[in-house]
Amino acid sequence: MGLDLLSTYAPGIFDSLLTWKGVAGLVVAITLGYLIISRLPGQKSRPKLLDLKTGGISFEKVAAVYDDYDKSYGEGDHGELHVKDKNKVFQLANTFYDFVTDGYEWAWGSSFHFSQRMPGLSHAASQMLHESRMASFLRLKPGMKCLDVGCGVGNPGRTVASCSGAEVTGITINEYQIKRAEYHNKRTGLVGYFKPVVGNFCAMPFKDKTFDAAFAMDSTCHAPKLEDVYSEVFRVLKPGGLFATYEWVSTKDYDPNNSRHVKVMNSIIFGNGLPNIRSWKQAEDAGKNVGFKLVTSFDLATAPPVGKPWYYVPELMVKYGLLTIQKALVRGACNVGLLPNEGWKVCNMVADMVPNLVEGGATNIFTPMHLLIFEKPK
């Protein structure tokens, strides 16, 4: 994030800016921050504020599509949020990523996942370390064929291909993300090593027993049921193949009868386009139910203890008001017609979720990185 990058490349600047008073100080602070951030490594590949798009949604349809998104959710017996029509889950996910893909790259980067902040490493380097673990978990070697389930714009797939030599194919339901993935492939010289394909990961366009291994990073949470996507992964894996996934789940500390817990989880669901939230035990059982053998199951958020928590950067964003600045910039651009008139609602939807995301992590009722490793029996 901007603050995280400032803390890495320009220590002390942001803290000193925070002591300034008045509108002039705020303008100078934002300008300096923008100038510093825009010159940092990797920033030229990110969309700029006024370049933000809404995927396959035209500007004039943003308001109507957002209203449909909002109305897609209902509450269960305990007040927990869920998508009312399970047949529209993938349409919802596709709409969500049309809305947020450019915004994610602008505000977060091209790795659409969380990771612990490791000692001595920047935010981006910590993310790549988190991604590269997959190659080790799956025992990948040059020439092996690996599937990235729910690849987004492809950074995890490119990292895994780069550090393992394996041929990685990614699948995402969102066509705009395919365009962004292909752009990043050319930029990084990985055309031919990482191949993005558009498709539904619960009905994949691949033949049986195609891949030697598969992984998913913070993506299968969008499936209507985990069994739906796990069964497809099982089908396309060769016998003996491994499937590793970082799952967004509730932990053993989550209490569905605790109204505060439910409110926090509902915010995470709505602000991330999820159908609901599963528990870690439900995720384990889903893999077993489709025929996998469970090899490993533990919450990576609890280890190693030397790293800063996965919610460290979002916590800084909340603490220093960066979310408020982002919301103001987007609202201003919308008001003068540079972005869709109602586009600020999408920005607010995600930004207003972040404090609850931090609370979910800090209270240990939610984790985005429960590691499951499954094996398809030989």
UniProtKB/Swiss-Prot annotation:
One GO BP annotation of this record: methylation
Catalysed reactions, semicolon-separated: squalene + 2 S-adenosyl-L-methionine = 3,22-dimethyl-1,2,23,24-tetradehydro-2,3,22,23-tetrahydrosqualene + 2 S-adenosyl-L-homocysteine + 2 H(+)
One of the record's GO cellular component terms: endoplasmic reticulum
EC number: 2.1.1.262
Disulfide bonds: none
GO molecular function terms noted in the UniProt entry: S-adenosylmethionine-dependent methyltransferase activity
Membrane topology: Single-pass membrane protein
Protein name: Squalene methyltransferase 1
Organism the protein comes from: Botryococcus braunii
